[in-house]
Amino acid sequence: MKYILSLMLVFSINLFTEDSEYKYEPEGNAAEYYIGNFNKGKDLDDLLKWYGKFSKWAEDKGVYDDMSVAILTPYFHADLASMDAMWVNNFPTQSAQYAALNAWMTQGGPELLKSLPLTNSRQVSTFQWVISTPADPEEGDLMVAIYTDCKFEEGYDGRKVYDLYKDFAIYAQSQGDTVGRKMIFPSAGYDGDADFVRLLYTSSIDGMGVNQELYWDKLDGSEASQNLKGFSCSNPREYIGRPMRGM
């Protein structure tokens, strides 16, 4: 009995150590990325009009109330011909994501899709960890979103990097930073080799410039910046975004 109790005590200590190993509990959500090119004779205005059709179709389904939508177009990008637009759906949970997918597939979504003025070449499902959120947008603002492919360095994983990034973001916000940050983990539909995709975004275009200057003036070289390690990133792509609902 004494031996069994000792084992139970060791097991309990190990569990506590594992639970307390990380500083923060990530705030997660699910997102879908629909990437494509406009059909002949169609453009962004047509896609924005089609959003109106989608919004009207979705309003009585009961599963889209907590979904946010943004439509992004590439601006600083290494291959502008590869895509014209990216439609992004964000859901609070994966259950909400798949409840919406079920409604789409069984309540008329495929029929509505026939009028989409864009042909998707990639559809990617992801899970995201929120590190920080941007300033509240003002009416009419366009957002900026920068996606970068990242790899973990030896000895680091998602939870370790998340804690370091969260520490950095908290310090950055104390200095006036208003950048939204996410660690995105792509799954179905993704054929790249990144461990995660970093998203940096601001709720206005000029906000990105202000925050970049703030980084070099106040954040670069700080202890929080020096502690932000364990990963490296490449291939940044910058988009202009139109928040359509819930952003």
List each model region and its residues.
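Sec-dependent N-terminal signal peptides
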Residues: 3-12
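Short S/T/G/P-rich N-terminal loop/turn motif that feeds into the first structured element of a domain
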Residues: 17-247
